[in-house]
Amino acid sequence: MADIILGIESSCDDTSAAVIRDGVLLSNVIASQQVHKDFGGVVPELASRAHEQNIVPVVSEALRKAGVEAKDLTAIAFTRGPGLLGSLLVGTSFAKALSLSLDIPMVMVNHLQGHILANFIRQPDVPVREPSFPYLCLLVSGGNSQIVKVKSPVEYEILGQTIDDAVGEAFDKCSKMLGLGYPGGPIIDALAQKGAPERFHFAKPNIPGLDYSFSGVKTSLLYFVRDQIALDPDFLEKNKEDLCASFQKTLIDILLGKLIRAAKETRIREVTIGGGVSANSGLRERIEAEGIKRHWNTYLPERKFTTDNAAMIAIAGWFQYKAGVRTPLDVAPVSRMADF
């Protein structure tokens, strides 16, 4: 009998539901919230209200597109955390109610685990390259920057992580400093493609081991821009493409420097990226180039699976379900999760 898993993702500002059958994606529906752009960031209260409005129609549409009924489901995978508590509570509560009504098990998923396993999302009639275990994953998003050793679909070891800000936050803060809007990552990426990445240079951290730090590079940009505007009020408008290209290159240099070191120390040549920042064109180009240079096997998730989506939650939940993992109904969402 086929395992049919419903995945539910509601950790931030996207309500998503997906259905997989024996590891093959049948549907992936996402309802994004546009209201936050007016505030320059996600407003938790508005996000949770939107999830409440979206969760039922999104799940219904995912089931319809998959061609299955709720009674056909084997289990429900849902994001427990990390994320915004109000948003997570909507998805968790819905998963509990559906689990009770259908008398089927729940499987909680760490949101980051979903990003790590995004390369395993299989689609009908679409060729897919899957990394072999163990592999390294550069996990980069608005809330996390980590190098993870993935031993199996359910076993992970964090080799390094940010000690302050995440790289996605650095992109957003840069965009705000330059008056470019939110979310900053895609805006900076687009402008960077028109700029000169060697034009400006910003401070890079000297952090031991495999950990990251991005607070210093943000401060370096802030002071540099402030000083230049004092000399020329039109500095930003004249140089925004070069500023974006140079700042983006600095962040990518920092990310890949530690990833290269991790690959050397572990002697692992299977390398992936995941998380929202893995959609960045500069990062994708550089990691592929490093892969060729260093004889890595590199794997890049499809861009549509880099941002928050339930397909990755469903595939992570499927792996856990096969491993015998079940989640009790008294589970509560958490904004932070200590480990995987």
Predicted regions and their residues:
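Glycine-rich phosphate-binding loop plus the immediately following alpha-helix
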Residues: Q113, K151-K194, K218-T219, Y223-D227
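Glycine-rich phosphate-binding/hydrolytic loop that grips phosphoryl groups
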Residues: H115-L117, P301-F340
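Short Gly/Thr/Asp-enriched flexible loops that form oxyanion-binding sites at enzyme active sites
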Residues: F78-D103, I121-R122, S281-E290
